[in-house]
């Protein structure tokens, strides 16, 4: 089965994605990561008002197979978290890129440099294909 990796998103090599909308970034976990983890049973996210830093741990996700840290693809302040995932972590499995499966929304510290260090979708797909 071929996994979807939308072209309008940017990716971190640890498989988090980010969707930019002006000064706001929506962060989630890629379909590849969700598929690798299997059935997700627990999600820990930062609180609104918390600061997240590029490539620093911002939470965790646990599945029936493994536990994994979540890393922030941007630097900024959390303005919203997807609280539905606390009671329904399986939403990540069902819709990682959609209205129900995102993790947090962040107000960016630096809009100009926000994409630095991230991969465009084509580069991310190529990395997955080569296993780098």
Curated annotation (Swiss-Prot):
Keywords from UniProt, A to Z, are: Lipoyl
Q: Which InterPro entries match?
A: 2-oxoA_DH_lipoyl-BS (IPR003016), Biotin_lipoyl (IPR000089), GCV_H (IPR002930), GCV_H/Fam206 (IPR033753), GCV_H_sub (IPR017453), Single_hybrid_motif (IPR011053)
The protein's organism comes out as: Synechocystis sp. (strain ATCC 27184 / PCC 6803 / Kazusa)
Outline what the protein does: The glycine cleavage system catalyzes the degradation of glycine. The H protein shuttles the methylamine group of glycine from the P protein to the T protein.
- Residues forming the Lipoyl-binding domain are 24-107
Among Pfam families, the record links this protein to: GCV_H
Assembly and interaction partners: The glycine cleavage system is composed of four proteins: P, T, L and H.
HAMAP family for this protein: GcvH
Q: Which GO terms describe its cellular component?
A: glycine cleavage complex
What is the designated name of this protein? Glycine cleavage system H protein
Q: At which residues is N6-lipoyllysine found?
A: 65
Stated family: Belongs to the GcvH family.
Q: GO biological process annotations for this chain's record? A: glycine decarboxylation via glycine cleavage system
What cofactor is this protein dependent on?
(R)-lipoate
Q: How is the cofactor bound?
A: Binds 1 lipoyl cofactor covalently.
> What gene does this protein come from?
gcvH
